[in-house]
Every structure is written in C-alpha cells, then in structure tokens.
Amino acid sequence: MNETIQVKIITPSSIAFEKQSKMVTMPGEDGMFGVLPNHVPMIVNLTAGLVQVYINNMHNSENTYLISGGVTEITSNYINIVTEAAINVTNLSESEISTQCYELQKLSSH
C-alpha cells in the first residue's frame, strides 16, 4: 500500500507544484475535503480557495496554494488539480493571503 500520493497543480502556463504527499486538502463545491494515498478514483469540481499539501506528516501542511477554482482528477496514486491560477501562499501572512485572494477574484471576474 502506497504511503504517498503524487500531487500536481497545473495552470495554463505551467505546472505550479509537483511532489509526493501524505495528504492534500482542497476546496470542493460541497466544502473542504481531504485525499489520502489509495483514494477511490473520482473527478471533483473545485471552488476558489486554499489547497494544502502535507509532505512529511498529516499534522502540518508544508505547501499552501490559493487557487481560482477548477477541477481535480484523483486516483489511488495521483492527484491532478487543473486551475486557471495558482498562487503559492505558503510563507505569506494572513493579510497578504487576503490581498492575493482579492487579486485572484479580480482576475477571475474578467
């Protein structure tokens, strides 16, 4: 049984993130949800919000991305998150994340 799952965050211009992970949480249309290795296959629509990637343990996320919404394809060994925009907000303060969120909303309304 795999202990990690491959995670990719894909935008039209680049692969914003790609690493093995212990767990990922993301914003679905019905609320936040988490994905662990060996998950059942599914495709989920995503809303704008934070994607948190847990690399070394499931208690502290090491990478956080603000996405503009999109879709994710999940299998037992990989997660592909396809989004129009993804901003790495891992090392930003709460107020800086709010500013980035506002900027992302302006971009997605055009």
Swiss-Prot record:
Top-rank taxon, per record: Bacteria
Gene Ontology annotations for the cellular component aspect, listed alphabetically: plasma membrane; proton-transporting ATP synthase complex
InterPro entries: ATP_synth_F1_dsu/esu, ATP_synth_F1_dsu/esu_N, ATPsynth_dsu/esu_N
Cross-referenced Gene3D superfamilies: F0F1 ATP synthase delta/epsilon subunit, N-terminal
Pfam families membership: ATP-synt_DE_N (PF02823)
Molecular function GO labels: ATP binding; proton-transporting ATP synthase activity, rotational mechanism
Keywords, in A-Z order: ATP synthesis, Cell inner membrane, Cell membrane, CF(1), Hydrogen ion transport, Ion transport, Membrane, Transport
Similarity field: Belongs to the ATPase epsilon chain family.
Role description: Produces ATP from ADP in the presence of a proton gradient across the membrane.
Subunit structure: F-type ATPases have 2 components, CF(1) - the catalytic core - and CF(0) - the membrane proton channel. CF(1) has five subunits: alpha(3), beta(3), gamma(1), delta(1), epsilon(1). CF(0) has three main subunits: a, b and c.
Name this polypeptide is given: ATP synthase epsilon chain
Protein species of origin: Rickettsia typhi (strain ATCC VR-144 / Wilmington)
Gene that specifies this protein: atpC
